[in-house]
Amino acid sequence: MRLRKYIAFAGMAVLMLCSCNEMENAPTNKFTDNSYWTSTTKAQYVLNMAYSQMYNAGRMWSDESLSDNAYDGRSVDDQRAIRKGMATPSLDIFKNEWKDLYGGIKTCHVFLEKVDLVPNMDASVKARMIAEIRYIRASLYFRLTNLYGAVPFFTEDITLEESRSVSRTDRETIISFIHQELEDIKDALPTRDQLPEEDKGKITKGAVCALQARVYLMDSDWNNVMLYCDNLMNKQGEYGTYALFPDYAGLFDEANEYNEEIIMDRSYVPNLITWGEMVDMIPLSRGGRAVNRVPQQSLVDTYLMLSGKTISEAGTDYNPAYPYDNRDPRLTATIIYDGYDWSGNVDDGSKDVVINIRPGSGTDAYDGGGNGTSTGYFTRKYYNPQASGDQNSGMNIITMRYADILLMYAEAVHETSGMTEAVWNKTIRPIRERAGFTADAALNFPAGKSKEEMRQIIRDERRVEMAMEGLRWYDIKRWKAGNEYLSGKVRGASFVDENKLDTRKFEEARDYLWAVPISEINLNPNLAPNNPGYGN
């Protein structure tokens, strides 16, 4: 595919542009030289470099590890400091995210400044490329505001001197800009149905609607969430045709990339531009290395029984002696547990392979130390049998999909007027049907629930459907539920020594935002004061 070819180039080119792409450093390589901009192809290279800077697998897994879904048990790094309530403005993770995001914005501004130099460029192609770069810039600013709140904001390239005097702009102004940008560019972009095969993976009008909905979701602007989700649910002739992919596990199979559920993803190129985080999440017997990032028990406990009951409610058929039997099939598609039928669930040509994790059970056994799992679980979702021996995978990372649209719509309806049977039947029910539920109690609208009970059902459905996809931490932040979900003891399977797991601490007045990096404040005192709780 043409996009993957350009991304392969971008993977090399980004090193040249971004190595000096911090906000305070102006790059001096050929991409900023007027002489570079001689063809549409060269402009496309820079555009696709911006695509590669917008999001990546590392960010997704890092975000997930900050939530209550995953636990990075071997780390002694910045993430652990954040999770334990010990973060300071000097953490490298704060500095590196800041640098990388402004590096992507720098690429966008270079493109916007230089693209008019390209001779004989088709006007419609240029308009579309400009719309794509503006979408990428909006996405980068959205992430910046989610992490840091008020940040430096500018819409054209700035000089070194300007970068060391610019002040922070309030989040509300930046969010308003994002919404207007997305509204302004949508008509310059094709729908999913209009994309030629070689352009699969590029930004579409549907992706604009999905990002609009997600930005409004962070602000609990429910009416606008419903508006933009409705565009994708009920106006598909205008915004593109989307549907749930029939097989939940198959969504995360390289063979099914760019299917009808995918609104936006981060494209990779097998054997060329890859990601390798899975090597530290899978069983040692299947190619794992030092298992760092593993699911938490609280996530496992959220999956329903096939009967539709939770594991703890009255009348449940949950059996603690066989805790994974008769559970929501998405559990098996997402998490590897003790007694996991590997050969039955992973198409890698193996025969009769079972993953045993209980102490003393073999290579993958929990031992409370070493390189094995710290919670008694491994990660299944996004495992790629076609990856290299060291788990370098060319599988795309999904950033937006249609199930998320249905879940956002369901949440927005409930928070405004209350969930109804009609809305349930076009949102939660089809998601559960696709997952493999057949029992009426699981599929039918649960009448008689209180507002809070229904809210929890919707939130739990979102958690299990989107688990290990990088969204949970942001959901907790927007719900202002940090103390509920991000404080207290990390739990593992029944055979795990929980004394060896962390106790998390969430400071309500501080931890919804990261600190502005102290290195940036040292360069530019106008960035002070820092966010609450981090000092000046």
Each model region followed by its residue ranges:
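Hydrophobic, small-residue-rich alpha-helical packing segments that form membrane-like cores
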Residues: F153, D157-N256
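Polar, glycine-rich mid-to-C-terminal structural blocks
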Residues: L211-D221, M226-P320
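Conserved, well-structured interaction surfaces
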Residues: S39-Y55, D77-Y148, S163-S176, L182-L195, ...
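Membrane-proximal, proline-rich intrinsically disordered regions
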Residues: C20-S65, Y303-A314, A321-Y322, E520-N536
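TPR-repeat structural position
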Residues: A43, W222, M419-E421
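Flexible, polar/acidic helix-loop-strand segments at domain edges
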Residues: E261, Y318-Y402
